[in-house]
Amino acid sequence: NDGHPVNPHMPVADLTGSMTALAAILMALLRREKTGKGDIIDISMQDSTMAWLPNVVGPVFAEDRAPIISNERSFGGYAFFSIYKTADARHVTLGGVEPKFARNLLTDFGRPDLLKIAISPPGSTQDPLKAFLRETFERHTLKYWVKWFKNRDICFAPVLNLHEAWN
């Protein structure tokens, strides 16, 4: 209601636990088929969910610290993995941090000089690029941007409400 996108409120632990269980069941069936022996399957929703967090657990293991969420790739630490407001108070999202997508967009925007920032690690180093993208996307409406991005090799999507997403 406040005009900002929200998390989709997906039951993530249920989903990851279910996918882990499915994989375990299929492997157990294959083992039974090949060896005639069964398996005991013990699935933890917590463990299943933790296995899906490789993008945010790097600091925990590599640097022995808690992640700074706003600096992490999956939470907007990269300018090219963020959500931006448009002129009509709608939103667009970029989802490709690979250099080719950054190069394509920044070249089309006439700012290839920002590529060095785009390919730098996530975090505050991305702030100047985020500011540029924020200012750029706020110049036009969502409809304009959807048309502008058509047939461009850039990971872009409009942020839709649930009704729009189903239609």
Predicted regions and their residues:
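Short, Lys/Arg-enriched charge-dense amphipathic segments
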Residues: 1, 59-70, 135-148, 166-167
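Active-site-adjacent "lid/gating" segments in soluble enzymes
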Residues: 1-96
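A generic structural signal for secondary-structure junctions
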Residues: 30, 57-58, 106-110, 167
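Residue-level detector of flexible, active-site-proximal loop/helix-junction positions
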Residues: 47, 163-166
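Aromatic-enriched alpha-helical interface/lid elements that frame and gate functional surfaces
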Residues: 80-158, 164
